Amino acid sequence: MTITGAILRNAVIYAAQLITSHRQEIDALNVFPVPDGDTGTNMSMTITNASREVRVKDDSESVSAVASCVASGLLRGARGNSGVILSLIFRGISKGLKGLDEADGAAIASALEHGSSSAYKAVMKPTCLLYTSDAADE
């Protein structure tokens, strides 16, 4: 299966809906390293901003263009540590997809590695980054 720009756009929009609808449950999971209970809220606000920005992308847009738009939207909308980390992950993913019209499984895995690496470089205690690293390995 290949991932087109339209598929990535729709996935981000759906992810924003899912995170928003489950933000209280995610907040309740937030106990380490700081138990402030706002991870779900911050991630929801962050990805909702990216979702708003990526909605205008046409079905013909490349996966590279959509990923770049998402990365920019996440960065501009980043809230809290989790939002910043999410934006860093996607900045790396965007770099990994740069120049591609579509992405196959190998390209997605490589992009996830870029995302994980990008975020790890910026975070001192990368607890939530383990998921991205594990996904890239799969």
Q: Where is each model-derived feature located?
A:
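N-terminal cofactor/phosphate-binding cores enriched in small/glycine residues
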Residues: 21-26, 30-32, 39-54, 67
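N-terminal amphipathic/basic leader segments beginning at the initiator methionine
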Residues: 1-25, 29-30
